[in-house]
């Protein structure tokens, strides 16, 4: 039985849905709430489509897609969550410059039919809770940095007034760290994945929770390259003939918090403290890579190794990942 791909371009209050059949498309706009989700199903049924064959291709726009995705899963629909960068690249490959909500929904449906992206698996309740705790920790960390920066700019006579705020945010972060690890240790699947990730040189207690919430069981990513692209660590090359040859870079999109968490482990690895990565660092140096490029390459390598140990269900092995 063939699938029906439905592209969904979603915003805060509305979403556009489109499915393609016989080289024509049907398009409609719905409200991004429970009533809109019900109307989406009625609209599909009105076109005589079997809902069991539906495959929703939803663009990952902020957190606006989450309610619809969870609703679709609860109604036994197949769902894929697609990085907006992939759709942008796909549109570029087709020579499409127009950008409207309707056009994006059509593109998503076409992309789904062509690529058949991996199915999205909703996080468990404890994974959702872990994600929320990490977001809260990041917020408190930003507040702490802000207070410390503000204190540096204050007169020596009033600096003491910010001490209470600094202590408050510091204590709050300590409490959140305790809650994060208590949750990981008390959740069998999280604890097991954490034990695998902990075997990777350089991956410590601050980085590990971020890897857990992004990678999950790994099934949401087609490959390690897919994960690296999602995290904003995939290299971008700028070369054309002999006249354009820019230094490769990464796209600073995707998971900013994960990149921040991987940065310090990568810096430590770049100093040659871990024998398992010494050959890799040496190869980068021999290729004439800058210190920054080496650190980014190590961040990407740590991420791809993390994906491998979870997908292969076995701890880090120097012989394989060297």
Curated annotation (Swiss-Prot):
GO molecular function: DNA binding; DNA strand exchange activity; transposase activity
Alphabetized InterPro entries for the sequence: Transp_IS110-like_N (IPR002525), Transpos_IS110 (IPR047650), Transposase_20 (IPR003346)
Physiological role: May be the site-specific invertase required for pilin gene inversion. Moraxella can express either a Q or I pilin; the inversion of 2 kb of DNA determines which pilin is expressed.
Protein's name in the database: Pilin gene-inverting protein
Disulphide bonds in the chain: none
Superkingdom classification of source: Bacteria
Species assigned in the record: Moraxella lacunata
Keyword DNA-binding: yes
GO biological process: DNA transposition
Keywords for the protein's UniProt record, in alphabetical order: DNA invertase, DNA recombination, DNA-binding, Fimbrium biogenesis
